[in-house]
Amino acid sequence: MTDWISRWETNRIGWHAEQVNRHLVKYLDRFNLTTGETIFVPLCGKTNDMLFLLEQDIKVIGVELSDIAIKQFFSENKLDYALSKVDNFALYESAGIKLYCGDFFDLESNHLENVRAVYDRASLIALNEDLRQKYVKHLSDIIDFDARILLLTLNYPQHQRSGPPFAVSKKEVDQLFNGSFDFQELYCIDDIENEPMFQNLGVDFVEKAVYLLQKVRM
């Protein structure tokens, strides 16, 4: 967690993308959301994907450890916000969006009121193997039954490059979510040709995948 804060303080945020993620645009309808419903974006940073969701009349709840990221999101998008304290979080709130500044693992279900979907572009792959299992367990505990998750992952030979982002295979996704979620692979491709950083490190492949998961009743 200290490293995450440090990266924002020193602007080492190579994972941040200025453009809206094309997979979110393509698969947005898979959430089956209607106007005014709410989506949760864990470890949200200052992603412009949240602005895209707002423009689709979808409400957003996010959680982020760094207040720098949250403040930059609002300032760069010229959005005013109100600041308050809610439990262990500083809550930054504007029209249609609530961003909790604090630890994801401190979130409870009441913080995610009316959330119908989860968008995980770079949360699971930002965590090491030990934390990934804890992350999925906690996420499952705090979201409602039938909530859908759009999950984006990377997979590559982990011994050829240290994370983050960490390698997460389809097998691991199945193991992590097995029993609590139905899941479907929507997309999977080896995209090493478009990853010069991985090429320079001698990585053999970079598999990018998109999954749709739905929490089921036990």
Annotate each predicted stretch with a short phrase.
Residues 12, 122-123:
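Short amphipathic alpha-helical interaction patches enriched in hydrophobic/aromatic residues
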